[in-house]
Every structure is written in structure tokens, then in C-alpha cells.
Amino acid sequence: MAAQYYMEFEKPVVELEKKVQELAELAGTNAELAGEVTKLEKKVDRMREVIFSNLSRWQTVQVARHIERPFTLDYLNLIFTDFTELHGDRLFGDDHAIVAGLAKLDGEPVVVIGHQKGRDTKEKVYRNFGMPNPEGYRKALRIMELAERFRLPIITFVDTPGAFPGIGAEERGQAEAIARNLREMAALTVPIIVVVTGEGGSGGALAIAVGDRVLMLQYSIYAVISPEGCAAILWSDGTKGEQAAEALKLTAKDLKELEVIDEIVPEPLGGAHRDHEAMARTLHEAIARQLKELKAIPAEQLVEERYQKFRKMSRFIEG
């Protein structure tokens, strides 16, 4: 599908695409013009392929944040069936920035948890811009404990700029909620698959991202802090986000090389936002394949391998 919103670096291909559309409207039944349209369409695809195969880290950040990228609820509708949402943390309230519930993947029951952003202003406010409060993480943990009790695999979708930093969130124990999730997820005896679909922002992402397999979409990002936040701390200038993005090494390719993630899931030409259904098909295959492998691993081994997976990410370099 054609994207409604374009990024600055796409401008050359977008301008050509508009001209192709105009020519296609003029062509009508003219076979000669129709042939030219086909040639130009192929040229558009080639241009887009060149652009997206050479994205800088900062450009990748822009793609990861694209407002039309599929969110958790989109993947729930396209990959899973029989989704039943579960609400509340049984302590404070329900956090709309995290969606959680029961679903079926290829007929098999699973638990699905994910950050949820909004597309328009009203929905963005309702979802708190995808930034969970402590009750969101406690809700996620409550649902994960249900998965443990009923021996259901857990699949999480990560897409958040970070945990909500408001005063109320701190008063209700934001840090404790995140830390507890990390500890409890590390010990769960059911398979856990994590998919970073857009932004993987710091502890706010990690609180639902301790898994046996961590996948990243091709143009998603995952880092300890946003580029703008990093720039504000290092140089007291949030506008130096592009420079910070290069230093953070936050792309899927970077993190695969660093062995932080296990698999990069290819996106459709131009990004997941251009074809939700194609992206969902590719991701469905990757999740199903990884889940089949994990189901064959004994629970005790699963927990030990998960622990070792995250333990080896800490490395000291002596200079």
C-alpha cells in the first residue's frame, strides 16, 4: 500500500512516484503509455531499494518511528486468531499503553503482550504515546504468570520510546515494576519470543523483552536511550540526535553483530508501513518457526539458556 506520510530522504523517489501516477491516469487504454508506466514503476522500485539498502542509523530511527508502521493490535489481527484482551494489574488500574491477552497462533493457544501506540492525537493520548506506567508492566507480569500456570508460550511485541517518566509513575514504583519483570521473566519455564517491531526504548522495552529468542524487524531500533536523550546528556543538545544514533549502534544489523538479538526479520520494500499484510506474513513465519524450536527444549534447559543468553551481554573491556 502507498504510505500517506513520507520521510525527507524519500523525497526523490516520492516525486517520481507521483509523476508515474499522473502518467498512469493519462495512459488509460493506450498500450504504449502503459508500457512506459510499467518501466517507470520498476525504476521507482529500484530507487527505493537503493535508498533503503543504504540507510544511515538516523534514517533507520525515522523509519522505526513512522506513524503508519504496524502496531501490536495490527499484528494481533493479522497473525493471531481468537484474541481475548485482559485488563488491569489488580493493584492500581489498566494501562492502555500495554495490550495483553490470550490468542491462538495456528490454532495453538498463546499469550500475547505488546506496547501499543496511537496514530491520531486522541489515540496517542489514550495510549500515552506507547509509554507504559508501572501498572502496565504489572499487568504484563500478571498475564505472564497466567501463561506460566497454564503452560502457554509468551510472545511480546516491543515498540516504545521508553517507560513513562512522570511523577505519578515514579511514585507508584516504575523502577521496581521494571526490575521485577526482568527477574520474573528470567525464571519463567515457558517459551518466550520477543519481537522488536519499532522502537525498543531502554528499560521500558526490556521490561517485556527478556526472552529465549529476540527478533527485530529490519528497520526497528533497540537502545539504552533515545538518540535525542543521549545527545541531551552527552552534549546538552537534543538536536544532535543524528550524531548520537551513530554512536548508539541501535539498528537490527548492529545488534545482531553484537549478539544482542537472534534474528532480523526482513521488511517489505520501503518498510513495514508500506505493506502491513506482507510484513505480518513474514513475521508469522518467523515466530512459528522459532516457537517450534523452543517447544522442543526442556523447561529447565530453556531457563538456563535464557539466563546465559542475557548474562553474556555484559562484557568488561580492559584498556
UniProtKB/Swiss-Prot annotation:
UniProt name for this protein: Acetyl-coenzyme A carboxylase carboxyl transferase subunit alpha
Location of the protein in the cell: Cytoplasm
Main localization, broad class: cytoplasm
Pathway info: Lipid metabolism; malonyl-CoA biosynthesis; malonyl-CoA from acetyl-CoA: step 1/1
Gene Ontology terms for molecular function: acetyl-CoA carboxylase activity; ATP binding; carboxyl- or carbamoyltransferase activity
Keyword match ATP-binding: yes
Catalytic reaction(s) noted: N(6)-carboxybiotinyl-L-lysyl-[protein] + acetyl-CoA = N(6)-biotinyl-L-lysyl-[protein] + malonyl-CoA
Keywords of the record: ATP-binding, Cytoplasm, Fatty acid biosynthesis, Fatty acid metabolism, Lipid biosynthesis, Lipid metabolism, Nucleotide-binding, Transferase
Oligomer status and interactors: Acetyl-CoA carboxylase is a heterohexamer composed of biotin carboxyl carrier protein (AccB), biotin carboxylase (AccC) and two subunits each of ACCase subunit alpha (AccA) and ACCase subunit beta (AccD).
Keyword hit for Lipid metabolism: yes
Function: Component of the acetyl coenzyme A carboxylase (ACC) complex. First, biotin carboxylase catalyzes the carboxylation of biotin on its carrier protein (BCCP) and then the CO(2) group is transferred by the carboxyltransferase to acetyl-CoA to form malonyl-CoA.
Natural source organism: Geobacter sulfurreducens (strain ATCC 51573 / DSM 12127 / PCA)
Domain CoA carboxyltransferase C-terminal: 39-293
